[in-house]
């Protein structure tokens, strides 16, 4: 067997144990579905040469804007940009945000080449303002490129993709932050056990999730990252969410019940990812990732758009230049003790609730709209205080000191659309919870995808009034991204509707479903 034909940028001694060359030498399929299966199965992962051919083909087929820099551009500009500096001393572009170049079994020449390529990309893409994932992408592509110019061209095609439905890498601080928020939403939905652990061991769980791209682009060992990148080039950005969720699931499985290795869970997760080979193989990691029944691409795109809108409304679109990624002031705003007051829950309990709500709403402080101590027990007054606000959080304290509540995604004014009859409304983002005697969140088990469909009138059902309750809300202009969505497929029109309110009762729940 002939040894792999590594290029001059690769440390051959390290590569022999990182990625073998034992597989097939050619790929003949052209159908997307077959490519997906082969990528997930690692068909070209066993052949260093074949992987290079596949990358060349897949990147060549990326639809790009008309003027996209190619290898000839690199040859023209690299001398002017680098000058007489040695490659090792070249500064990294500002858009990588002090992200270090992963070694990925590159030799010193290869690491210097990555710096040169990044600087030339910065010269040709002035619109790319924040892209900490790019050093890892360039370092991997350099393995499978004949020279620096070819690697530059491949990276440029990834950045220049003009297919709006095919997002590849975040290129602005706004896109990066909204992706972090979207990942937090997905963790909240699909990794509840891990999320509960994160809430328990970290002061700000959102800071932990803001590190998710670093797990993939930098901390994962080369053989793992290459397998992820194989599938990423075929299937796109959603794969990154899947793998990051799988990493968090494995971290929870290994570390649950064990003391953390440091007082910083972010550092513990990074260390876990670096040594992930001790826990799971690349095959098992991808198997776990694709076993998650994730939202569709369209649904994730809607969630991403809603998170971007929330950031824009907060005026958060660019990163403060003086703050590094590891020390930057995170945009997520926790519940501040000085600005929060409730007769039912304290700041710690409200922060627990805030860790469950969609991240675009966790940007804001809760605002007290209604309290039975202040406003009495009139439902009319309750509706008057809450109308025009969404979402709201309902808190109830019983005479036995038990505390429960619900996160309600939709404006209570929706109840007026039923012509005086009682009817259910709401979206699949709603949930109920208990804080005393123990903390527990309950989801609506029927819901697989949130949607607002046509309300369905039901017969009135009365519920006894509670001794004390209050409602907190976000600004009225923060609408759920699913309010205008009509494309989700649900078995029943009423399965995402479980808010109802009339003149004599208020109902959270639905006779057709179950809270668990």
From Swiss-Prot:
Where Phosphoserine occurs, residue numbers? 473, 480
Q: Where is the Rab-GAP TBC domain?
A: 34-236
Mode of membrane association? Peripheral membrane protein
List the PROSITE patterns hit by this protein, alphabetically: TLDC
Please state the span of the N-terminal signal peptide per the UniProt entry. none
Which cellular component, as a GO term, is one annotated location?
Answer: presynapse
| Chain sites annotated for binding a 1,2-diacyl-sn-glycero-3-phospho-(1D-myo-inositol) | 36, 40, 238, 242, 293-297
Where in the numbering of this chain does the TLDc domain appear? 343-516
Location of region: Disordered: 456-476
Q: Which UniProt keywords apply?
A: Cell membrane, Cell projection, Cytoplasm, Cytoplasmic vesicle, GTPase activation, Membrane, Phosphoprotein, Synapse
Question: Which InterPro entries does the entry link to?
Answer: Rab-GAP-TBC_dom, Rab-GAP_TBC_sf, TLDc_dom
Cellular localization per UniProt: Cell membrane; Cytoplasm; Cytoplasmic vesicle membrane; Presynapse
Description of its domains: The Rab-GAP TBC domain is essential for phosphatidylinositol binding.
Name the PANTHER family on file.
GTPASE-ACTIVATING PROTEIN SKYWALKER, NUCLEOLAR PROTEIN 7/ESTROGEN RECEPTOR COACTIVATOR-RELATED
Q: What does this protein do?
A: May act as a GTPase-activating protein for Rab family protein(s). Involved in neuronal projections development, probably through a negative modulation of ARF6 function. Involved in the regulation of synaptic vesicle trafficking.
Subunit structure of this entry? Interacts with ARF6.
The identity of this protein, by name, is TBC1 domain family member 24
Name the source organism.
Bos taurus
């Amino acid at each position: 067997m002939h040894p792999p034909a590594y290029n001059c940028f690769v440390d051959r001694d390290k590569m022999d144990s990182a990625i073998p060359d034992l597989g097939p030498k050619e790929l003949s399929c052209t159908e997307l579905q077959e490519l997906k299966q082969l990528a997930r199965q690692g068909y070209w992962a066993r052949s260093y040469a074949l992987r290079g051919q596949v990358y060349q083909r897949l990147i060549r087929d990326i639809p790009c804007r008309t003027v996209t820099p190619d290898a000839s551009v690199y040859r023209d500009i690299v001398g002017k940009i680098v000058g007489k500096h040695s490659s090792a001393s070249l500064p990294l572009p500002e858009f990588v945000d002090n992200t270090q170049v992963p070694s990925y079994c590159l030799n010193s020449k290869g690491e210097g080449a990555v710096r040169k390529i990044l600087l030339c990309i910065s010269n040709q893409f002035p619109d790319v303002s924040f892209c900490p994932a790019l050093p890892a992408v360039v370092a991997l592509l350099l393995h499978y490129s004949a020279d620096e110019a070819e690697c530059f061209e491949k990276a440029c095609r990834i950045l220049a993709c003009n297919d709006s439905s095919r997002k590849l890498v975040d290129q602005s601080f706004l896109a990066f932050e909204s992706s972090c928020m979207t990942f937090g939403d997905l963790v909240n939905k699909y990794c509840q056990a891990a999320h509960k652990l994160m809430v328990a061991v970290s002061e700000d769980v959102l800071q932990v999730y803001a590190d998710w791209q670093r797990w993939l682009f930098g901390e994962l060992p080369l053989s793992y990252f290459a397998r992820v990148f194989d599938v990423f080039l075929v299937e796109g950005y959603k794969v990154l969410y899947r793998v990051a969720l799988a990493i968090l699931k494995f971290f929870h499985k290994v570390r649950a019940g064990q003391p953390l290795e440091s007082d910083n869970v972010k550092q513990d997760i990074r260390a876990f990812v670096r040594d992930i080979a001790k826990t799971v193989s690349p095959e098992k990691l991808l198997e776990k990732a694709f076993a998650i029944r994730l939202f569709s691409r369209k649904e994730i795109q809607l969630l991403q758009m809603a998170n971007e809108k929330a950031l824009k409304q907060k005026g958060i679109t660019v990163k403060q230049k003086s703050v590094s990624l590891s020390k930057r002031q995170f945009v997520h705003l926790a519940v501040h003790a000085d600005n929060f007051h409730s007769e039912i829950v304290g700041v710690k309990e409200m922060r627990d609730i805030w860790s469950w709500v969609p991240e675009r709403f966790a940007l804001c402080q809760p605002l007290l709209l209604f309290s039975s101590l202040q406003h009495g027990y009139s439902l009319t007054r309750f509706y008057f205080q809450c109308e025009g606000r969404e979402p709201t959080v309902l808190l109830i304290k019983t005479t036995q000191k038990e505390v429960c509540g619900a996160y309600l995604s939709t404006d209570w004014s929706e109840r007026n659309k039923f012509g005086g009859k009682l009817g259910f409304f709401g979206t699949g983002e709603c949930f109920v919870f208990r804080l005393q005697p123990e903390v527990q969140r309950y989801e609506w088990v029927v819901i697989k995808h949130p949607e607002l469909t046509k309300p369905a009138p039901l017969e009135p059902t009365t519920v006894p009034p509670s001794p004390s309750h209050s409602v907190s809300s976000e600004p009225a202009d923060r609408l759920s991204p699913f309010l205008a969505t009509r494309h989700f497929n649900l078995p029943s029109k009423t399965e995402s509707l479980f808010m109802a309110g009339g003149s004599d009762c208020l109902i959270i729940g639905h006779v057709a479903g179950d809270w668990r």
